[in-house]
């Protein structure tokens, strides 16, 4: 046991040894605090006196200086107070005594203080630099917010720059806006705090009620210029009756302001709505009085059931047409501030949908917040956009790869603080989105389990299971993500239970028609883990095509993730990006200097200082060709390749060569003319019609014969048939 632990001490005696516990750590902190507390406001040993509200309070310089940087500078910093015995302070007396007790004892019982004293102590803690006490009081006040104290606490929080306490107060006022406007404490708000409250979109109450409260506040604060305050009242949100019968008779607004408000209300396409804010809560629910007002089978959309649905029940739908009125429309119970929508598309097969989402405040003017009309999507959709007041949500399907109907099983709408990085409205994820949980699916390839490539298990694999494969020259592996993501990296685990190597390339697409090659390893011999980095772009489909296996004619992949989750590789990417930005900045600086020289000399030097092409100039066909780090900063344009066609259903079982292939993968690729394959064009291939294209094909016949029978493979060339 360590020297700071407990020990046992034994001693001899007629009745045997006796054991006694002891410790080498002496902790008498409570007694020390009590002794120090007795010195508080005690004449004994006192060497300074504070004059507060004409009362003399003795204190000890060294204790105050040790506890506060403010007092150290005041009492030992060479100022006039350094040599003075008596120092006057302009602070509340009772609150100062409370603070002194805290300085000497380190404890403070806040429950014994009234609200005014608590605020006074908070102010002195801020003034004298007691940050721990300031934070403790701030946290205490957060727990006891009420209508009769929130205005006072907000003023104090803003005065002392307590941002967290300020935000909590504002959110409390948002939640209780209607009651707060009628409470007498509202009239005690400072002008600056009132303006901060009124400018918030989520301070949600009828605008006429807000106007009346501001008008009343102006009468209680007649010495304040309230013109800037009343300017935060959103007059266009009031109807004509309120403007003419409430606002105009008050006489506090110019008649032209009222006319402008009437005109804006009738002509504006984007009124400055206020909305209720319920963080992290689904407001598209029956508990918030929300309802589906357009679409077929409307009751299913907001019932909260996202598990018990099939081909006949459990979804809301609309026919996909060119009509502007087509779609599924949800009316929220009231105006709500939202920035996130979760939507479950019908996913009992591998079909894909395209759609867009619009929001509105009046069903007349719609703002499109998400547009995936040109992208294939499936299952759960995670949509993010700039927070805004919303009353109506419209979902419009533009494509179904099986028929002309758009099916939605469930919808959630909320305001969340967990917003990922967005690039051109696409989510740029940090975590792996090529997973079953994120609605990804393997549409092409051969495996014992459908989604072995994206199930997250890259440890349990062997000769017979745990991988997805295709035959060289006549197949491919295709993964479809749940929705378009803005991606710039991937990581792939090639089957590596022996020392074989592979060659391959990777293409990406958003619609399975137009492909871009982003990784080219056809001339490399690779094995095990492979990291890739390419120019970021929207991605839905990922196509992996093997071109060589040094052991047999089958290409095997164990695991795919995008973006890569390799922390070391991500750090290298970040470092390389910083270096690239630094070089671009230096180029711009050099070009600016050259332009200045050219303009001064009167000669054109633009051609002599032209920039070299950047790596992003050919981003549409950029290909990463190096297997080693760092990736080449100069990408080489390569004509995109289309994979060979799959063998039609009913073809003979895959060959099982027992020796490594001798033919060139490039020759095989040329002999099999490439062709595009639609995922929705044909029927399923029977699992029993294929033999097992296992890595074990390279072993001897005797070894293969001794193997136990294995489950049949699943052919993942998925075709929708509904």
UniProtKB/Swiss-Prot annotation:
The keyword Magnesium does not apply. Residues 597-606, 670-679 have a biased composition (Polar residues). Residues 577-594 have a biased composition (Basic and acidic residues). Disruption phenotype: Adults display increased motor activity during locomotion, fragmented sleep and a decreased lifespan. Walking speed is not effected however flies spend more time moving with slightly fewer pauses resulting in longer uninterrupted bouts of walking. The total duration of sleep is not effected but average sleep bout length is decreased, the number of sleep bouts is increased and the amount of wake after sleep onset (WASO) is also increased. Dopamine levels are decreased by 50%. No effect on flight or climbing (negative geotaxis). Detected in the brain (at protein level). Residues 151-247 form the BACK domain. Keywords: Coiled coil, Cytoplasm. It holds the Pfam family BACK. Signal peptide: none annotated. GO terms for biological process: adult locomotory behavior; circadian behavior; modulation of chemical synaptic transmission; positive regulation of circadian sleep/wake cycle, sleep; regulation of synaptic transmission, dopaminergic. Residues 577-626, 640-722 are annotated as: Disordered. InterPro entries: BACK (IPR011705), BTB/POZ_dom (IPR000210), BTB_POZ_domain_cont_9 (IPR052407), BTBD9_BACK-like_dom (IPR034091), FA58C (IPR000421), Galactose-bd-like_sf (IPR008979), SKP1/BTB/POZ_sf (IPR011333). One of its GO terms (cellular component) is cytoplasm. It comes from the Eukaryota. The keyword ATP-binding does not apply. PANTHER family: BTB/POZ DOMAIN-CONTAINING PROTEIN 9 (PTHR46306), BTB_POZ DOMAIN-CONTAINING PROTEIN 9 (PTHR46306:SF1). This is BTB/POZ domain-containing protein 9. The gene is BTBD9.
